[in-house]
C-alpha cells in the first residue's frame, strides 16, 4: 500500500470531564508522576489477571530465549483495567523502550510513519483505541507488522516517487474496548489476542493497599476492601477513590483510613455500596420511572439522560451488565429486578428474572 505524506490539521475533539467513577483517565492522570509511581513495573507486582500474566510470562521467556521481539499483542476489555500498564511492563521485562500513543492522534499517514521509523530494534509501540485507526493508517501498518517495511510515495504529482523504508523489528501492542470493531485484516496480524476481565473486590483490595503504601497513607484491610467493592471492578477507579478518601482522611480525621472514614468519604462522593454513582442511578431510574423498566432503545435512552450513545455503551453499560443491573435484548435495554430492588422499587412480575452479581459469592 502506497501512502502519500501530506499535512492536514483537524480541530481537537472536545470531551466532558470524567466523573470520579469514570473508567476513562482524567487529563491530570494522563500526565501525573504520582499516577506513574502507582503503576506496577513488573509482572510479579501486577495484581490480578492471572491467566493473562501466565500467557505473557511464557511469551516473554520464549522471546528472550530466541533473542527476538515479542509477537504483536492485542488487549481488549473495558477501560481502566491496565492495558497501558501491561505494555509498559512488557517493555520493562524485555529491556526495551515503549512509545505510547492513541489512534485519534494518528490521523495522518506521517504521524504513524514518524513513530515507526524512530523505533529501535525490539521496541514496543502501544496504540490505545486501536479500533479508531483511519483506513490509510491501518493499511500502512499491515506490511509494517508482517514484514517490517513501509511503502511510501514521497512528493507530489510529477515529482512523486515510490520509496520503501525498512523498519527495525518491533512489537505492536494494541488496546481496544471494542474488539469487534477491528477489521479482520488488522486483528489477524496479532499473534496474541488477550481479554482483560473486571477485577474481584479482593484483588482491588490488594491494589488499594499497595497504592496506600506507596502514598504513605495508613489504611486498614477493611477500608481497602470497602474501596475495592465500590470501584466497579476497575483498578483505575480504585486508585482514584483511594486518593479522594486519603484527602478526606487528612482533612476530616487524623490521616488514617479506617472503615468508617472510607464509608463516610465514599458517601460524600455519592458512590453507593454497589459502586454506582449518580449517573448510573439516573440511567436506571429513567428506565424504570419513564419506561417501566424497558425495553428502551439506546438512542431514546441517550436522549432521555442527556448522554451520548458512546458514553452509555462504553462507560456505564459494561459494569451495569456485569453486575446484573441491566440486560440487552433485541428490543432494547431492560432494567433487571436487581436494579429495581437496588433503587427501592418493586419490579413487576413480567420483568426479566433477576440476575445475580458475579461478586455475590465473594462477599
UniProtKB/Swiss-Prot annotation:
SUPFAM superfamilies: P-loop containing nucleoside triphosphate hydrolases (SSF52540), Winged helix' DNA-binding domain (SSF46785). DNA binds at residues 328, 333. It is found in: Cytoplasm. GO terms for molecular function: ATP binding; ATP hydrolysis activity; four-way junction DNA binding; four-way junction helicase activity. Keywords: ATP-binding, Cytoplasm, DNA damage, DNA recombination, DNA repair, DNA-binding, Hydrolase, Nucleotide-binding. Its EC number is 3.6.4.-. Signal peptide: none annotated. It comes from the Bacteria. Residues 28-37 have a biased composition (Basic and acidic residues). ATP binds at residues 38-39, 80, 83-85, 146-148, 189, 199, 236. The keyword Zinc-finger does not apply. CDD domains: AAA. Residues 200-270 are annotated as: Small ATPAse domain (RuvB-S). Residues 14-199 are annotated as: Large ATPase domain (RuvB-L). Its main location: cytoplasm. Coiled coil: none annotated. One of its GO terms (cellular component) is Holliday junction resolvase complex. Residues 273-363 are annotated as: Head domain (RuvB-H). Residues 1-37 are annotated as: Disordered. PANTHER family: HOLLIDAY JUNCTION BRANCH MIGRATION COMPLEX SUBUNIT RUVB, PTHR42848. Has 3 domains, the large (RuvB-L) and small ATPase (RuvB-S) domains and the C-terminal head (RuvB-H) domain. The head domain binds DNA, while the ATPase domains jointly bind ATP, ADP or are empty depending on the state of the subunit in the translocation cycle. During a single DNA translocation step the structure of each domain remains the same, but their relative positions change. This is Holliday junction branch migration complex subunit RuvB. The gene is ruvB.
Amino acid at each position: 500500500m502506497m501512502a502519500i505524506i501530506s499535512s492536514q490539521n483537524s480541530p481537537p475533539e472536545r470531551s466532558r470531564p470524567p466523573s470520579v467513577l469514570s473508567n476513562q483517565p482524567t487529563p491530570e492522570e494522563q500526565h501525573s508522576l504520582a499516577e506513574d509511581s502507582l503503576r506496577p513495573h513488573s509482572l510479579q507486582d501486577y495484581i490480578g489477571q492471572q491467566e493473562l500474566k501466565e500467557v505473557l510470562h511464557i511469551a516473554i521467556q520464549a522471546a528472550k530465549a530466541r533473542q527476538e521481539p515479542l509477537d504483536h499483542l492485542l488487549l481488549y476489555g473495558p477501560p481502566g483495567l491496565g492495558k497501558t500498564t501491561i505494555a509498559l511492563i512488557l517493555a520493562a521485562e524485555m529491556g526495551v523502550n515503549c512509545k505510547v500513543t492513541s489512534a485519534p492522534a494518528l490521523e495522518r499517514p506521517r504521524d504513524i510513519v514518524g513513530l515507526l521509523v524512530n523505533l529501535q530494534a525490539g521496541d514496543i509501540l502501544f496504540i490505545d483505541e486501536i479500533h479508531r485507526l483511519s483506513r490509510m493508517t491501518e493499511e500502512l501498518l499491515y506490511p509494517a507488522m508482517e514484514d517490517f517495511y513501509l511503502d511510501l510515495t514521497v512528493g507530489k504529482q510529477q515529482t512523486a516517487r515510490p520509496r520503501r523504508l525498512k523498519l527495525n523489528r518491533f512489537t505492536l501492542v494494541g488496546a481496544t474496548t471494542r474488539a469487534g470493531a477491528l477489521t479482520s485484516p488488522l486483528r489477524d496480524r496479532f499473534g496474541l489476542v488477550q481479554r482483560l476481565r473486571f477485577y474481584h473486590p479482593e484483588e482491588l483490595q490488594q491494589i488499594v493497599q499497595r497504592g496506600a503504601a506507596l502514598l504513605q497513607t495508613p489504611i486498614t484491610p477493611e477500608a481497602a476492601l470497602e474501596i475495592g467493592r465500590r470501584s466497579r471492578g476497575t483498578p483505575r477507579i480504585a486508585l482514584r477513590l483511594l486518593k479522594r478518601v486519603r484527602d478526606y482522611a487528612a482533612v476530616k480525621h487524623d490521616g488514617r483510613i479506617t472503615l468508617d472514614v472510607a464509608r463516610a468519604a465514599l458517601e460524600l462522593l455519592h458512590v453507593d455500596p454497589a459502586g454506582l454513582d449518580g449517573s448510573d442511578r439516573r440511567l436506571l431510574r429513567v428506565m424504570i420511572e419513564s419506561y417501566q423498566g424497558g425495553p428502551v432503545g439506546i438512542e431514546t435512552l441517550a436522549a432521555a439522560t442527556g448522554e451520548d450513545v458512546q458514553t452509555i455503551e462504553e462507560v456505564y453499560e459494561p459494569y451495569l451488565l456485569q453486575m446484573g443491573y441491566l440486560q440487552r435484548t433485541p428490543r432494547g435495554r431492560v432494567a433487571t429486578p436487581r436494579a429495581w430492588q437496588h433503587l427501592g422499587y418493586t419490579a413487576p412480575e413480567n420483568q426479566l428474572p433477576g440476575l445475580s452479581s458475579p461478586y455475590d459469592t465473594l462477599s
